[in-house]
């Protein structure tokens, strides 16, 4: 054991994964960190393996994916693992963010950790979008066309930026090549950001806890207690992932992407992967192109303002009934946006999308500060009696 505390590299591992003192009362909602690290690891390993057999060319991309599926030993397994772990990654990230919002993990002194986490989310979305283009099916081509075209909303220089991204006048071979290069690069950037996220948390006050108070009253070492606790959820994760990979590998995908990309034929509905749907719904709900793009980016960056807009004296909403109601309305609204993003742009969905978009942004900018001020006042009234 002594080498763990003296060796320059091993002592870092020791301080993060063995001796790290964690609050004794953290629940299973604090297990997402290890699960997300596992997801990133799986994605990098399967991604590099796929890259060994993939050809980033508009003529060969679709066929090279079919070659991976049919001819490469266990290629189908590697590809389905990659595709379904991507979904698992986002599902767990949304739960992780939800945990952070519920328990006030964004409040000082964890503001930096929260900010880095938001950057991680943005990089994840960029990586996922780039990866979705690579199989070069119908949804890949048209999804790439629609999303890259968003840049044309920027006044004056927009169209030039779009053509710069494309490397031509439409999505072409140059586009596919650069998307492949970036999709290969960004997961490593993501790994670096995840380390920064960990360091920012570790070097301030460590994990929070369900009570929202100091964790210093009762702590336990990370090993063996929390190693074992993390392993419980890791095994559950593998079981659920296996069910998807082996029994319904295409349940979360789009059948349209099994049709080779055809620039002459637009699919009936251009829909991104399920995990980007809420933001796609926000983008589509505003008729003005530029304002839609601004709203979509604002919806992601709104997480950054939580440390400023939450004016409550208490950390988290677990002991704040009004905030708890607001939080659950926000979650329900997010799920509604996810449904609307998959629908056609027609009458009931347009209006519903606009209401949901307003409610989503209002939660961060209006509802949270107003409700927290009301609760502060009620607490003061109750304590003065």
From Swiss-Prot:
Binding site for heme b b566: 96, 197
Listed Pfam families: Cytochrom_B_C, Cytochrome_B
GO terms, biological process: mitochondrial electron transport, ubiquinol to cytochrome c
Residues annotated to bind heme b b562: 82, 183
Cofactor(s) this protein cannot do without: heme b
Any single GO CC term annotated in Swiss-Prot or TrEMBL for this entry: mitochondrial inner membrane
Location of this chain's protein in the cell: Mitochondrion inner membrane
Residues that hold a ubiquinone according to the record: 202
Record's cofactor remark: Binds 2 heme b groups non-covalently.
Transmembrane annotation, as ranges: 32-52, 76-98, 113-133, 179-199, 226-246, 290-310, 322-342, 349-369
Leader peptide range in chain numbering: none
Main location: mitochondrion
Top-level taxon of origin: Eukaryota
Complexes and interactors: Fungal cytochrome b-c1 complex contains 10 subunits; 3 respiratory subunits, 2 core proteins and 5 low-molecular weight proteins. Cytochrome b-c1 complex is a homodimer.
Misc remark: Heme 1 (or BL or b562) is low-potential and absorbs at about 562 nm, and heme 2 (or BH or b566) is high-potential and absorbs at about 566 nm.
Protein family (similarity comment): Belongs to the cytochrome b family.
Protein name (database record): Cytochrome b
Lineage: Eukaryota, Fungi, Dikarya, Ascomycota, Pezizomycotina
């Amino acid at each position: 054991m002594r080498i763990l505390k003296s060796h320059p590299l091993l002592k870092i591992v020791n301080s993060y994964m063995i001796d790290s003192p964690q609050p004794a009362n953290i629940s299973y909602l604090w297990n997402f960190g290890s699960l997300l690290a596992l997801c990133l690891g799986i994605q990098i390993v399967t991604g590099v393996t796929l890259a060994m057999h993939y050809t980033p060319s508009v003529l060969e991309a679709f066929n090279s994916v079919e070659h991976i599926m049919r001819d490469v030993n266990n290629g189908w397994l590697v590809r389905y693992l990659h595709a379904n772990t991507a979904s698992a990654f986002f599902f767990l990230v949304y739960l992780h963010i939800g945990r952070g919002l519920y328990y006030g993990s964004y409040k000082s002194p964890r503001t930096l950790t929260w900010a880095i986490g938001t950057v991680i989310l943005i990089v994840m979305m960029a990586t996922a979008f780039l990866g979705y283009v690579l199989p070069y099916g119908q949804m890949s081509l048209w999804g790439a066309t629609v999303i890259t075209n968003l840049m044309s909303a920027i006044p004056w220089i927009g169209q030039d930026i779009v053509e710069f991204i494309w490397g031509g006048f439409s999505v072409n071979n140059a586009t596919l090549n650069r998307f492949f290069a970036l999709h290969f690069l960004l997961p490593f950037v993501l790994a670096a950001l995840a380390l920064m996220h960990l360091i920012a948390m570790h070097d301030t006050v460590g994990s929070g806890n369900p009570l929202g108070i100091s964790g210093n009253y009762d702590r336990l070492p990370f090993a063996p207690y929390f190693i074992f606790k993390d392993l419980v959820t890791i095994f559950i994760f593998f079981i659920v992932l296996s069910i998807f990979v082996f029994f319904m590998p295409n349940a979360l995908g789009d059948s349209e992407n099994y049709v080779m990309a055809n620039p002459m034929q637009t699919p009936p509905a251009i829909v991104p992967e399920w995990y980007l749907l809420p933001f796609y719904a926000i983008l589509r709900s505003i008729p003005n192109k530029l304002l839609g793009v601004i709203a979509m980016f604002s919806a992601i960056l709104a997480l950054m303002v939580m440390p400023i807009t939450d004016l409550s004296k208490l950390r988290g909403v677990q002991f704040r009934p009004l905030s708890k109601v607001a939080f659950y309305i926000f979650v329900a609204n997010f799920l509604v946006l996810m449904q609307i993003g998959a629908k056609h742009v027609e009458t009931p969905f347009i209006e519903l999308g606009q209401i949901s978009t307003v409610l989503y942004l209002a939660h961060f900018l209006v509802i949270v500060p107003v409700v927290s001020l009301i609760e502060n006042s009620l607490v003061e009234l109750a304590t003065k009696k």
